[in-house]
């Protein structure tokens, strides 16, 4: 299962690290996005197999599950941005 985490800040980064450390998912099946290149590079240092990008649409396109981990006032904009690639069989959290 491919998982994309949109927003790799404090919460999204913690979710990504927890999933990558666990046994249910491989780090190589996780993609994280952030506006902050520094946050992405920090995540990549600890988990080199995690995919990183600043392109939310790219991340959502390849995901079976999308976790939106941004501040509440950004959620509507993120949904509007990724809407073109959303499908009924994809889970959004």
Where are the regions a protein language model picked out?
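Rossmann-fold NAD(P) dinucleotide-binding segment
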Residues: 51-93
